[in-house]
């Protein structure tokens, strides 16, 4: 069984390999002589520290909640597949719900470490490796709210029924 240090070195090597795909990080490493992995891990550590102690936590979490999902949402607009549309529409519905609820009840005051919870939830829902928004959609939104949005629902196709009735006359 590999020791903790061996696993950490392996993970750092994998992360370094992944980060080597980005020329900006390679240039930064050459100019500063600081390994890009340590720069990224340091920035992630500072970011997490600030969110944990709610030093600009709301801004930092909302920034993270917009940056990555915003990119992937724009990407989804230019593809023809439906799966990514469901992923990102669900993400934005849950994100909007969290934002409205947090402002309505002053969540950061009533729930300690609220921004850590929101940050972890946002990452889980938005990262392509986890597709958590799909889980939220299939586990909660579709079973609970799906009956209000089915094609047979009066509210969902009332306009179509009215148009069909007016054309038949």
Swiss-Prot record:
Topology with respect to the bilayer: Multi-pass membrane protein
Cytoplasmic side stretches: 1-35, 77-86, 125-169
UniProt subunit comment: Oligomer.
Keyword Transmembrane helix found: yes
InterPro entries reported for this sequence: TB2_DP1_HVA22
Lumenal side: 56, 104-105
Species whose genome carries this gene: Aspergillus fumigatus (strain ATCC MYA-4609 / CBS 101355 / FGSC A1100 / Af293) (Neosartorya fumigata)
GO cellular component, one term: endoplasmic reticulum membrane
Protein name: Protein yop1
Zinc keyword on record: no
Family assignment from sequence similarity: Belongs to the DP1 family.
Subcellular location: Endoplasmic reticulum membrane; Golgi apparatus membrane
Transmembrane portions of the chain: 36-55, 57-76, 87-103, 106-124
Source superkingdom: Eukaryota
Record key words, sorted: Endoplasmic reticulum, Golgi apparatus, Membrane, Transmembrane, Transmembrane helix
Subcellular location, principal: endoplasmic reticulum
The record's note on its domains: The short lumenal loops between transmembrane domains 1 and 2 and between transmembrane domains 3 and 4 may impart a wedge-like configuration, thus deforming membranes.
Function summary: Required to generate and maintain the structure of the tubular endoplasmic reticulum network and the vacuole. Induces high curvature in membranes and causes membrane tubule formation. Involved in membrane/vesicle trafficking.
């Amino acid at each position: 069984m590999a020791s903790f240090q061996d696993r950490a070195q392996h993970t750092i090597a994998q992360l370094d390999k992944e980060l080597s795909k980005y020329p900006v990080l390679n240039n930064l490493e050459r100019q500063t002589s600081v390994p890009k992995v340590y720069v990224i891990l340091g920035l992630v550590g500072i970011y997490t520290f600030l969110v944990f102690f709610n030093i600009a936590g709301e801004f930092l979490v909302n920034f993270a909640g917009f940056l990555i999902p915003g990119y992937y949402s724009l990407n989804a607009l230019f593809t023809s597949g439906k799966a990514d549309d469901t992923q990102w529409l669900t993400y934005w519905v849950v994100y909007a719900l969290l934002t409205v609820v947090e402002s309505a009840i002053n969540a950061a005051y009533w729930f300690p470490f609220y921004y850590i919870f929101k940050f972890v939830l946002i990452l889980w829902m938005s990262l392509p490796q986890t597709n958590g928004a799909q889980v939220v959609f299939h586990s909660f939104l579709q079973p609970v709210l799906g009956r209000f949005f089915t094609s047979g629902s009066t509210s969902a196709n009332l306009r179509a029924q009215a148009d069909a009735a007016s054309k038949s006359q």
